[in-house]
Amino acid sequence: MLEVKNIHAAYGKVNVLRGIDLHLEEGEIVAVLGSNGAGKTTLNHNLCGLYCPVEGSVKFSGMDITGWRPEKIVEMGMIQIPEGRRLFPNLSVLENLEMGSYKRGKASRIQNLERVFQIFPRLKERREQLAGTLSGGEQQMAAIGRSLMADPKLMIFDEPSLGLSPILVEEMFQLIADINRQGMTILLVEQNVVQSLNLANRAYVIENGTVTLSGKANKLAENPELKKSFLGL
């Protein structure tokens, strides 16, 4: 479904990504792991069209989308749930959700909204409440719901556990698993190594803009290099 080949990216003269290769098959959960500054968010931005790679290519559903504008990539079915959630705090929950379906017809919007409220009954209860008054966990639900309103094929989660309590982190990862079981392909970009490897089918580890480890998640969980670098073991 997604094939990334030899992606290089830079901010001015500062190289951030140096030859990233990765792929996702339909129905998978694939994790991209790394510490702050490793290049994870830059990779996301290059996949979603916010930045154009200096070199390399991005293919999605068999089409080369390198350099496409973000809205065209969203129309193709790839959508990002951004770090920090990026809701409109002075709009209601319902208005924020509807932002995700502005390109959809009325029938599609209604159907997708029913689906979101089925997954997140709490959002239905708070649909008229201002998004800025929600708790951190509820805001993350709203950000995910907004993305589901676009009827995506691939969801890219950028640090979904950031700023959440341990209990809410558990709930968030369970929610991602539930969405995947409904057939959604997921790219999970995270610092939470243990939870991510428990959830994912495969994983890539990025350090200083390059992939240093990759493979099946259960195998990587036992890798001594990863344990030393990220778990202090």
Pin down the residues of each PLM region.
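Glycine-rich phosphate-binding loops of nucleotide-dependent enzymes
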Residues: M1-L233
